[in-house]
């Protein structure tokens, strides 16, 4: 039996002129190896910065909120999806789209404080 070859999917979706969601998914067969979904904001021309990131680093799905300097505003907030990773990915994506304005607004407040 040959070893399963990892499948990597990278996708980027522009959700408004200054906001995009980047998806990085790695799986082996039906097993999720790594998932990262990041809401990014273009603070100036071609300067995209991570605002919120969901990922499975460390083996647990969690959310990090980031500051303009790249530090953690919140770190490793556990996320309970209780679903298969296909549905979790969809729920995270949909949640980021629906809350993008709020997340970016909070991020921009921090930009003004810097």
Which role fits each region the language model picked out?
Residues 1-49:
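Negatively charged, low-complexity tracts enriched in Asp/Glu with abundant Ser/Thr
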Residues 6-12, 18, 22-24, 55, ...:
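Small/flexible residues
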Residues 10-12, 26, 31, 40-42, ...:
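Glutamate identity and glutamate-enriched acidic tracts
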Residues 18, 59-61, 85, 95:
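General helical secondary-structure elements
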Residues 31-76:
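A short, structured beta-strand/loop element
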Residues 69-114:
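Acidic, low-complexity intrinsically disordered segments
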């Amino acid at each position: 039996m040959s070893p399963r070859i990892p499948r990597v999917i990278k996708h980027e979706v522009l959700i408004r002129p200054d906001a995009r969601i980047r998806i990085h998914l790695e799986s082996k067969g039906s097993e999720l190896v790594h998932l990262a979904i990041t809401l990014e904001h273009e603070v100036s021309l071609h300067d995209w910065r991570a605002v919120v990131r969901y990922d499975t680093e460390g083996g647990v799905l969690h959310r990090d909120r980031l500051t303009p300097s790249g530090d953690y505003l919140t770190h490793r907030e556990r996320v309970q999806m209780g679903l298969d990773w296909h549905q979790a990915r969809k729920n995270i994506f949909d949640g980021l789209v629906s809350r993008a304005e709020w997340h970016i607004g909070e991020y921009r407040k921090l930009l003004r404080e810097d």
